[in-house]
């Protein structure tokens, strides 16, 4: 991340969201890719695409047609991701020599050291929680209404569609060392409080 954005993020991390300057906030939440109709929008981190790999003289990329995104950043794509996390279903592992139950003890072990926003819901039957230490993010009124409407839908039950609250590697509550989610609403731009887990942490 460039020095200018790092400076703003550091400053904002010591303030409440209501104290952020409008000008600096606009600088780190901007995403010019959503205005370009010729390309798919990119997820950015504080307005920067620094974590996406690009061809360079020292690491040239030669490709015919579309090339999957890659990253040279420390922490890779977790530097800009949304931290969604679900265990694989057996249908996701059809070409693997193992089944999801073989991984169960390792999912539980990994989650011991990570912030985990999750709750028992309609996803749990197909996607076990693998943790008893659940600290779910509080849903907005709109999200709660959506989930309630889906729960009442006969169509969802007939088609056996699994749904529920997003499972996120996100620190919902303040702990001894770090603040929890401030519910500022800018998660998709990056979290100045480092509540969204990155593998570089």
For the regions a protein language model found, what residue spans apply to each?
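Core domains of carbohydrate- and sulfate-ester-processing enzymes
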Residues: 48, 52-54
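Glycine-rich FAD pyrophosphate-binding loop
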Residues: 1-23
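Conserved redox-cofactor binding core of oxidoreductases
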Residues: 24-47, 58-63, 67, 89, ...
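Short, solvent-exposed loop/turn and secondary-structure capping segments
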Residues: 8-12, 83, 174-175
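Conserved phosphate/anionic-ligand binding catalytic regions in large, soluble enzymes, centered on
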Residues: 69-84, 187
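Short, solvent-exposed loop/turn segments at secondary-structure junctions
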Residues: 5-6, 78, 85-87, 170-171
């Amino acid at each position: 991340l460039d020095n200018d954005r790092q400076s703003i993020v550091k400053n904002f991390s010591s303030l409440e969201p209501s104290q952020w300057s409008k000008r600096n906030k606009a600088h780190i939440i901007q995403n010019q890719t959503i205005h370009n109709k010729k390309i798919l929008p990119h997820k950015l981190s504080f307005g920067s695409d620094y974590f996406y790999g690009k061809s360079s003289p020292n690491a040239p990329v030669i490709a015919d047609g579309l090339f999957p995104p890659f990253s040279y950043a420390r922490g890779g794509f977790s530097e800009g991701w949304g931290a969604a996390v679900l265990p694989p279903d057996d249908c996701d592992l059809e070409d693997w020599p193992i089944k999801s139950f073989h991984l169960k003890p390792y999912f539980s072990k990994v989650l011991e050291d990570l912030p985990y926003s999750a709750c028992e819901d309609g996803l749990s039957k197909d996607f076990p929680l693998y943790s008893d230490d659940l600290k779910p993010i509080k849903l907005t009124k709109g999200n709660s209404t959506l989930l309630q409407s889906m729960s009442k839908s006969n169509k969802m039950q007939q088609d056996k569609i699994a749904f529920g609250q997003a499972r996120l590697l996100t620190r919902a509550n303040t702990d001894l060392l770090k603040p929890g989610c401030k519910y500022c609403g800018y998660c998709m731009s990056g979290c100045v409080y480092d509540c969204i887990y990155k593998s570089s942490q």
